[in-house]
C-alpha cells in the first residue's frame, strides 16, 4: 500500500447529500486521513440528486457522498458514473401513527405524510422511496394509501411540516428516520420497523472520467474511508470529541451520534439485497434502468485489492 508521500497532492470539490454523512468526513478531515492520501477536499451540501449528478458530469465536483438510486438509470444512458464503496447497507425506520398499528399492512386506506417522489429538479427523494418499499413489502399497493406530500425534498423544513401535519390531523401516519421522541411526547404511537436492506449513507460516488484524471484516485478514496472507519470504531473517546465539535459548528448535524460512525462497515462492500432494493426503486421511476445490470454501477476492485492485501484485517488485529 502506497504511503502519503507516494501520492501526487490534489485538491477536489465534493458534495455531501445528507448532513448525516458528515461524521465520517469530519473524522477523515480532523484525524488527518485526507492528508494521509494527499487529498484536500472542499465539501458542500447539495440537496438534489439531479443537481449533484450534473455537477459530477460537468466537472464542478469530483466526488459525491451519496446518490444511491438514480445512478443505475444514468449507467443505462451511457453516463460514466460509478460507485466505489458502501459503508451502510440498511435503514431501520419507524412508523408513527395516530392510532396504534401492529404492522405496515394495517395502514391500508390511511393518509401518509411524506415528501414527493421527486424534487423540483427531478431528483429522486430516496427517503420517500424507502417508505414506498415498506408499503410494498407489507403486501400493499402504493395506491392503497393516500400520500400527503408536504415538501419536495428531505430537509429540516420537511421534518417541521411533517410533525405539523400529524399534529393538525392532516395525516394518519408517517415514516420517521431517527429520533421519534417528540412524536411520543405528543401522544402518537410509534412502531419500530424491521431493517430494510438499502444502499444509503456516505457512499463513494464519482465518475470513470475522474478516476482516470487523478493519480490513483479510487485507491485513495477507498483507503481514506477505510482508515476513517477504523479510527471511529477503535477510538471512541476521540471520535466523540470530534462529533461534539461538529454538532456545535453544524446545526443540521446536531442529531448525529457515535453510532452513526461506529456502525459503518470495516470492509464497506455493498450488500446484494441493498443493491437490489436501490435498483428496484430506480426502475420504478426510470424503467430504462432495467436494460443494464445493477452491478454495472459498482467498481469494487479498489476495495477488493485493499482487502486482499490483508491491510484491513491487520488494522483490526488485537482489538
What annotation goes with each model-predicted range?
Residues 2-149, 175, 190-198:
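Short, glycine-/small- and polar/acidic-enriched structural segments
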Residues 69, 150, 154-246:
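Pocket-lining segment of extracytoplasmic ligand-binding domains
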Residues 101-105, 208, 212, 267:
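Proline/Glycine/Serine-rich low-complexity intrinsically disordered segments
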Residues 214-291:
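Secondary-structure end/capping motifs
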Amino acid at each position: 500500500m502506497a504511503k502519503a508521500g507516494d501520492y501526487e497532492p490534489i485538491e477536489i470539490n465534493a458534495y455531501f447529500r445528507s448532513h448525516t454523512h458528515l461524521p465520517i468526513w469530519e473524522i477523515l478531515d480532523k484525524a488527518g486521513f485526507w492528508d494521509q492520501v494527499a487529498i484536500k477536499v472542499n465539501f458542500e451540501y447539495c440537496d438534489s440528486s439531479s443537481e449533484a449528478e450534473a455537477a459530477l458530469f460537468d466537472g464542478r465536483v469530483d466526488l459525491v457522498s451519496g446518490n444511491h438510486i438514480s445512478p443505475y438509470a444514468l449507467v443505462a444512458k451511457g453516463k460514466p458514473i460509478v460507485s466505489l464503496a458502501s459503508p451502510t447497507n440498511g435503514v431501520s425506520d419507524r412508523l408513527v401513527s395516530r392510532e396504534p398499528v401492529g404492522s405496515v399492512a394495517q395502514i391500508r386506506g390511511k393518509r401518509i405524510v411524506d415528501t414527493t417522489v421527486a424534487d423540483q429538479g427531478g431528483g429522486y427523494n430516496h427517503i420517500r422511496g424507502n417508505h414506498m418499499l415498506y408499503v410494498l413489502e407489507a403486501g400493499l399497493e402504493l395506491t392503497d394509501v393516500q400520500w400527503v406530500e408536504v415538501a419536495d425534498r428531505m430537509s429540516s423544513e420537511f421534518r417541521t411540516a411533517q410533525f405539523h401535519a400529524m399534529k393538525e390531523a392532516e395525516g394518519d401516519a408517517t415514516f420517521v428516520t431517527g429520533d421519534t421522541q417528540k412524536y411520543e411526547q405528543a401522544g402518537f404511537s410509534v412502531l419500530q420497523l424491521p431493517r430494510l436492506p438499502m444502499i444509503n449513507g456516505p457512499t463513494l460516488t464519482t465518475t470513470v472520467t475522474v478516476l482516470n484524471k487523478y493519480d490513483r484516485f479510487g485507491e485513495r478514496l477507498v483507503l481514506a474511508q477505510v482508515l476513517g472507519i477504523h479510527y471511529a470504531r477503535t477510538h471512541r473517546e476521540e471520535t466523540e470529541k470530534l462529533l461534539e465539535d461538529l454538532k456545535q459548528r453544524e446545526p443540521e448535524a446536531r442529531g448525529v451520534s457515535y453510532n452513526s460512525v461506529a456502525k459503518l462497515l470495516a470492509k464497506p462492500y455493498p450488500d446484494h439485497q441493498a443493491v437490489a432494493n436501490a435498483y428496484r426503486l430506480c426502475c420504478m421511476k426510470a424503467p430504462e434502468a432495467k436494460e443494464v445490470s445493477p452491478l454495472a454501477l459498482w467498481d469494487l476492485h479498489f476495495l477488493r485489492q485493499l482487502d486482499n492485501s490483508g491491510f484491513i484485517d491487520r488494522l483490526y488485529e488485537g482489538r
